[in-house]
């Protein structure tokens, strides 16, 4: 006589509460403490404490390449961790997020009176530590969304909450540090400004990670994804011309955003050169605000534009706005119009960014239509890897521009009169070139809206025939 073993019924996932959604969104506020403090202020901080712009650029380049490798390893690590009764992603976020806050604080503790070699070593070690912990915590944070719910409306709410959380810290940092960073008079004063503020931010960030752990839930078993080797990733890119075009077009629009990391220096040396302290603080705040937040304001218009112009047309519009902004910044000397030019650059980049992941999905369908094979994982890995590589180059370019224009490191260092003119030219020309190349590459992108309709219809016929 055989006895059947009763299988426990699977628990029906509960609806997410507003606290679950707020808890998840708050996590990206904490994540952005590191990202925003790096992208908005770290290059300026390094250079103001005397680290040469070329050295600063190379630190950024090496660290971002390091981060790209760590992200690949972090994904494998997260897959191998076994869940307990409370899941696994939340505890990984806290496990690495809290130490990351310590690493961020340490980045801004470089003593001003030590040997330059020690300053550089301190900068490298603490920045790499931040990149390591940020990747190890960032991967499970992204995966947590899928483990919380399968409902598409709830997932959209979680994504929106994440965007709000990230943008919120950009605003906080802008109005806290931007007005003051260009008004301090020496390195000691800079340290007294940065360290207490950053330490408070990071303490709050650590508490936010604990809040996330307490308020989020993991109730969906995320199936193990097939491992994608580096060779598979390269094949998916090289054999898929649509994906290859998207990767390079994305890379060059990212390059067009490179001046954001040196925004406070652009404000001081170009837009408010010789101005009083109040005007300098105002201009620095506005430049930082534009780089940090105006793209988020423009983001909701992306789907509307795509509805009328298509994603490819929306990309062209973004590049056109960036090109206009670059030309304006080079030739228009008026401070307020220069700020408009920077805003056009930021809006243009956001419009391009709006379409990247949707177009990535289209390239998967295109490749299946051409070859009969689907490469979802490899395509995502390939695009992400390209973004990391071009992101490294973008991080390098900001400080490198300062070096190429003859800017001297340090605080209140008398700059050659040609520096302001050279900076204006470079800060307009480099983004302009990035947008021009991005638009030129996108011209060859084969998946228009009409073509995609044809691809979907033919794939549907193939799938139906295969199931018959």
Where is each model-derived feature located?
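Membrane-embedded alpha-helical bundles of multi-pass transporters/translocases
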Residues: 2-468
